[in-house]
Amino acid sequence: LASQRPEPIPVFAEMSSVNPIFVMTGLGDAKMDEIATGLHGSATLGAGQFCTNPGIVLFPAGEQGERFVESFLSKMRETAAAPMLHEGIRKAYGQGVETLAGRDGVRLLLAPEETAGDGRCHATACVLATDARSFLSDESLLEEVFGPSTLLVSYEDSSELNEVAEALEGQLTAS
């Protein structure tokens, strides 16, 4: 109908983007903590409903990567529930998290709390984790979960990092 108008109505839509963040090796702990702080702010801004929400974060495996994950998790645990746009979106968020958490090789590090009964349509943050090999073997992990969830993907070396980057389809943003 819109395309039949003398002047068609343009549609500008961003339909599903995981907006990957690439955390590189060789950064000091202070910089990693700074990245975790910024990531927390971006992942939870507006209950994760911004189109630039970082849904996938690649980080180096090993001790420094583990400290990064702990820093990020501590910040996400302190995040209060925030309002979703409507109940249908909140339900889809819960279903998306449940689907991801059920995939082989994915661990649920911080589960979202159920808030359906409070009448406020709020959601809490969620953090999941996997490794690059598991990520590459399951295309469903490329799907966006709309809301305050983050999938952390550890990589062993630059070769694995490049493989994951090549597997990602077009994205609205990447950092």
What are these regions, as identified by a protein language model?
Residues 59-172:
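NAD(P)-dependent aldehyde/semialdehyde dehydrogenase
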